[in-house]
Amino acid sequence: YTLNGYLQQLGASTRVIRNDEVTAGELEQLVAEVDGVLISPGPGTPTDAGVSIAMVGIALRTGVPLLGVCLGHQAIAEALGGVVTHAEELMHGKVSRVRHQGDSFFAGVAPEFNATRYHSLAVVRDTVPESLSITAETESGIVMALRHRELPIFGVQYHPESVLTEGGYQQLGNWLAVAGLPNAAGLAASLSPLLVQEW
């Protein structure tokens, strides 16, 4: 619910739906009533995540802005033909340096930033389908963010809602701007927590 709280602070009206609460058909009807969908983190694999894979298909058909976080990011990759497998290293509450490629999702975010990771699965880089571009990665080349080349579909492996993730509010605000809340990106800059680092 932290992600939900961040979205509300950025001006979004939200509704939380569990991935096993609705059928794919019911989900399609619900999506027709919203301006954007976020597939949140969770346990398990994308194929075990209820209607998450179906949601990606709906976004592909309807063009509704979609953001996948952690498991949601993996669901996007898998739905489009990518492979998700066990990560080389378990990352539970660990911070990594992430470098982005200048995509608009990262507007206002430093080219390299700290991101908090909680995952044991990862998208296999060599299997990322042509329809997706890799927009951020770790120093060792682990895929940290994806974007559909033609549709407003984004995924991040790390947790933008974690207090130790730099620029998390900004990234969510940028996505909300794509989903129809143009003021969210500007508001995000004023809400981003100031991290003090000891030297």
Predicted feature residues:
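Short, charged N-terminal beta->alpha structural module
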Residues: Y1-L10
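A short beta-strand-loop structural module common to alpha/beta enzyme folds
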Residues: G11-E21
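Cysteine-nucleophile active-site neighborhood
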Residues: L30-A107, E112-N114, L172
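Acyltransferase
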Residues: V163-W199
